């Protein structure tokens, strides 16, 4: 296969990847996860754009130490962020799994 044919194939694959990435971003923006802390005492809902869309706090926590409540909120947000990041990585892995990019153009050797 000559270099022009390889480059043509690479461009086609890049266009497919760009379209897939746009579709994935759309799907991920609609994803909603829940992050929890304190055994469900604090629950955060977050979408794929990392926007917090809902915060639920059990009423019994309102009588507790404010620092504990702050820590629980931070932990719930961090839990939601980790879930979004995991979902994003899984989606990207799915997208790149089917791509046919010649490894000799990527700095490796064919078959690596």
Swiss-Prot record:
InterPro entries: YbaB-like_sf (IPR036894), YbaB/EbfC (IPR004401)
Principal subcellular localisation of the protein: cytoplasm
Annotated TM spans: none
Cellular compartment(s): Cytoplasm, Nucleoid
UniProt keywords, alphabetically: Cytoplasm, DNA-binding
GO cellular component terms attached to this protein's record: bacterial nucleoid; cytosol
SUPFAM superfamilies for the chain: YbaB-like
Molecular function as annotated in GO: DNA binding
Assembly and oligomerization: Homodimer.
Similarity comment: Belongs to the YbaB/EbfC family.
Role according to the record: Binds to DNA and alters its conformation. May be involved in regulation of gene expression, nucleoid organization and DNA protection.
PANTHER family (alphabetical): NUCLEOID-ASSOCIATED PROTEIN YBAB (PTHR33449:SF1)
Name of the protein in question: Nucleoid-associated protein LPC_3038
Top-level taxonomy: Bacteria, Pseudomonadati, Pseudomonadota, Gammaproteobacteria, Legionellales
């Amino acid at each position: 296969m000559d270099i022009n044919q390889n480059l043509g194939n690479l461009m086609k694959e890049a266009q497919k990847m760009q379209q897939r990435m746009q579709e994935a971003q759309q799907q991920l923006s609609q994803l909603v996860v829940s992050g929890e802390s304190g055994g469900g005492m604090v629950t955060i809902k977050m979408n794929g754009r990392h926007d917090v869309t809902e915060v639920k706090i059990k009423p019994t926590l309102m009588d507790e130490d404010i620092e504990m409540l702050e820590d629980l909120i931070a932990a719930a947000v961090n839990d939601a962020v980790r879930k979004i990041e995991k979902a994003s990585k899984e989606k990207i892995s799915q997208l790149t799994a089917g791509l046919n990019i010649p490894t000799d153009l990527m700095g490796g050797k064919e078959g690596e």
